[in-house]
């Protein structure tokens, strides 16, 4: 029985029901947030553990285990940048370049401003042989963080693999200027120096790289390459050529040279390169237009020695010097110009050059043999004199990229018959294919002038020569095969000769048999619009130990 004073429960109002519903939603949201946080902490903990395990596996070079660990972790935590970044690096280290590049592209689509992953992407491109595509990516990463020396080293390596040795050398040297204890930068500079023909400099840089903890595998490869470059070689060969000595529009002597030679190379104290060559050549010049009892202007036997030293360890400053001696003897007394009392010739060569960023200034001097057909002042008889051509030149080369090269030269030459020549020239080349075989086109323009004409050698006055060429060259590691071919068209105008246009082709092939027997062949041939033909062949073989 209900008391009159006891009130019955009132039904809930709409406002009260809304408050109850909001409270319930708050409890549910808080529970879900706590559950998500707990799950995130668990996922983060698992991701961190996966990173630790994968890094340890990578340190052991167990890249397959590292990759599988990271892939499992990414299934539970697909947005984790650290997991994805390490996976991209592991795939690159294990040479799965396509997968690595795809992973990096996913990363950079999410985080385009990440310099670290941008550099990793560039590195994977370079390692996979796409150095051309890697270079702009490296530049973007460096623009985002120029203090990362590892990125700049990767950039320099990509430049070198792309053929831009000038740019690579300059970048490695900038890294070394920032940190002289960076072993990998010294190692990269060592490789570039060797590719520029300076193995003694590479040897010095490699030792610095080793002292500063450079990559051991890279050190081993560079040391093996230097050891191969230092191996002494000795060999023999044969050369033959036919040239034209044009002295007027109606006179073109035929100059022929044939004979064997022996040569050798060695490195003294891992510091100075040395080369020597001894040859025994037959030289003669024919005047086919003379209706006399002989068409020989001269007929000589030459015994020649040449020795050269190069001083390349002080890279980027380089120097070389050499001396040559020739002894002549007459082979045939029935000649128009018999050999006189002077039977010896001494020549020399010297060059100094340096790599200054993308510029290469140079200076040089040479003295080369040239046969002078003269008249004896005392007797009035014809006589052949072993004359000399002494030249000095200044040059400047510019390598703005892997594709483009330009150079210019100023030279002054003096002949023993009181003649002189001044020449100014320049050329430019463009490499339109950098894969093997490499293809390049070039164009050169040269102006020159002699003090006077000569009956002994070609003396075009106030001449302008245009030359355009196409060159193909390549290298194959199998058999250390080095090959190339070139075609050139040249056109020359002068004040004392009719216009001359010449087509010239040349080829070379060098290889190594059984790892220690280098063999080589070189040949060229030309024909001009006056039907004058020239050719030359050189065969060589040597042993390396």
Per-region residue spans from a language model:
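Bacterial N-terminal signal peptides
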Residues: 22-33
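Boundary at the C-terminal end of the N-terminal hydrophobic targeting segment
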Residues: 35-42
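N-terminal secretory signal peptides that target proteins for export/translocation
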Residues: 1-18
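Gram-negative and organellar
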Residues: 42, 46, 53, 89, ...
């Amino acid at each position: 029985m209900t008391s009159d004073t006891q009130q019955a429960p009132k039904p809930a109002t709409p406002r009260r029901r809304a408050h109850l519903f909001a409270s319930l939603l708050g409890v549910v949201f808080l529970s879900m947030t706590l559950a998500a946080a707990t799950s995130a902490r668990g996922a983060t903990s698992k991701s961190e553990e996966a990173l630790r395990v994968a890094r340890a596996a990578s340190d052991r070079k167990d890249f397959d285990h590292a990759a599988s660990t990271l892939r499992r972790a990414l299934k539970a935590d697909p947005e984790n940048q650290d997991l994805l970044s390490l996976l991209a690096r592991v795939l690159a280290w294990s040479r799965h370049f396509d997968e690595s590049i795809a992973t990096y592209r996913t990363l950079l689509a999410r985080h385009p401003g990440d310099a670290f992953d941008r550099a990793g992407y560039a590195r994977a491109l370079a390692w996979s042989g796409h150095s051309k595509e890697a270079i702009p990516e490296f530049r973007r990463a460096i623009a985002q963080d120029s203090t990362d020396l590892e990125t700049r080293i990767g950039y320099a390596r990509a430049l070198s693999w792309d053929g831009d040795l000038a740019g690579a050398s300059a970048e490695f040297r900038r890294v070394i200027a920032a940190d002289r204890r960076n072993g990998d930068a010294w190692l990269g500079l060592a490789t570039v120096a060797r590719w520029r023909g300076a193995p003694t400099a590479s040897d010095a840089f490699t030792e610095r790289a080793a002292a500063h903890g450079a990559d051991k595998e890279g050190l081993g490869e560079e040391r093996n390459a230097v050891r191969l470059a230092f191996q002494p070689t000795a060999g023999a060969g044969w050369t033959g050529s036919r040239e034209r000595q044009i002295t007027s529009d109606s006179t073109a002597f035929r100059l022929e040279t044939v004979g064997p030679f022996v040569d050798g190379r060695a490195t003294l104290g891992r510091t100075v390169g040395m080369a020597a060559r001894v040859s025994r050549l037959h030289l003669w010049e024919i005047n086919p237009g003379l209706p006399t009892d002989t068409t020989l202007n001269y007929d000589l036997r030459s015994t020649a020695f040449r020795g050269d030293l190069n001083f390349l360890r002080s890279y980027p400053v380089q120097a070389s010097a050499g001396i040559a001696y020739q002894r002549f003897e007459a082979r045939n007394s029935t000649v128009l110009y018999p050999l006189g009392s002077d039977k010896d010739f001494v020549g020399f060569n010297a060059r100094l050059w340096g790599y200054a960023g993308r510029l290469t200034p140079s200076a040089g001097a040479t003295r080369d043999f040239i046969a002078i057909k003269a008249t004896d002042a005392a007797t009035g008889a014809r006589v052949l004199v072993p004359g000399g051509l002494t030249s000095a030149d200044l040059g400047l080369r510019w390598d703005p990229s892997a594709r483009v090269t330009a150079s210019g030269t100023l030279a002054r030459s003096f002949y023993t018959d009181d003649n002189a020549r001044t020449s100014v020239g320049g050329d430019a080349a463009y490499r339109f294919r950098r894969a093997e075989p490499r293809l390049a086109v070039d164009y050169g323009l040269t102006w020159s002038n002699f003090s006077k004409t000569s009956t002994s050698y070609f003396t075009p006055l106030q001449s302008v020569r245009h030359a355009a060429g196409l060159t193909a060259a390549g290298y194959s590691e199998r058999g250390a095969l080095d090959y190339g071919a070139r075609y050139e068209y040249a056109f020359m105008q002068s004040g004392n000769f009719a216009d001359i246009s010449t087509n010239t082709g040349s080829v070379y092939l060098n290889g190594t048999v059984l790892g220690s027997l280098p063999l080589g062949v070189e040949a060229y041939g030309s024909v001009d619009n006056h039907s004058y033909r020239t050719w030359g062949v050189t065969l060589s073989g040597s042993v390396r130990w």
